[in-house]
Amino acid sequence: MLVMPAVGTVMNVVLSGLFTSLTITLSHQVIISILTALAAGILIATSVRVVAILNSIGVVLELLVLLGAAVGLLFHQHQSLSVLGSTASVQGHGSYLWPFLVVVALVVTQLVGFETAGAFAEETNKSRIKPSQAIIAGLAGTALVLFIFDLALLLAIPNVGKAMADPNMIPDVLTSALGSGFAKLFFAGAIVSVFSTAIATLATIVRMIYGMARNGQLPGSGFLTKLSPSTDEPLGTILVAVVLSILPLIFIKRIPVIVAAITALIIIPYILVFGALLVRRLQGWPRSAAQFSLGKWGLPITVAGLVWTVIILWDAAWPRTITNPHLGPLPVIEDLAIGCFVIGLIWWFASLRNKPDPQGAAAIDQPARE
């Protein structure tokens, strides 16, 4: 649920680039984020097929917009490749390895939407194969296109020193190089792609809540699993997901703090999955042939993924006045993480501890049947 405020924040950034004369205040940011969540919830309540189509359109459009802008920027270079090693007169201290790792870690957050979009491949007949293939293809394509766009954008900056102090650096560079018309077209396409990301993100949240409720892992499972007779969608789950996505925007007015907390907290499930997967692999899993497999690369990729996500979490949770301030006894990210852990622990002891595994521990070793 915490991801949706971040998506709404990105929508505010895109709108400010499209309407340069518009001054977006904090109230505007909250309202736009809430409207984005509501609109996504309404669309999800109609049909999962409609959502999948809109998601596909958004992914393709975003890649085309980024690639088109990158090609255009490459024809308006103001910098040479040597700018990649320039500090723009900023004094460095020690090795640049750690700043480089921090920047790369932050770029990972740009890939979350495409990974979420790949989850819609579960709606195909080969649900054990297609999601993995779609996610890998989506991440690889996104990484390549983002690399080209970021490189082209950096080379097209007229003055790197001034750009570093410009809060509207991307719109200004696009307008300077390609004209206001193309810049607005770029951000118009970005609005569609960001909204499709909002739909994909909320749909994934709904699917997660519904799946846990169906297995009796959440309170109010009867309400959460009740399907609409007309659309066959879990309207109760959709409503809960939208409301929980909006609540952080209402109670926390510091948008950068919300985004930073979201960035950190969404990394924790990845670490848990990687950790559990590493234990299983060290125990010899998988013991049978699978239709999709990483083969001998499975263990090293799992270790590398676990180490990298820990680095990302370490960076996101670092105490900072702007993004991770002390709003309580601890920095806000640590406060939220501990709060979520305590609530989950209480629920586990109160309700889940004695419940049997709905599928059985051996189910994970069974080959998929399509």
Each predicted region: which residue ranges?
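TM-loop-TM module centered on a large, flexible mid-protein loop between adjacent transmembrane helices
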Residues: 16-22, 90, 134-199, 218-258
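Membrane-interface loop-to-helix entry segments
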Residues: 28-79, 135-140, 259-272, 294-305, ...
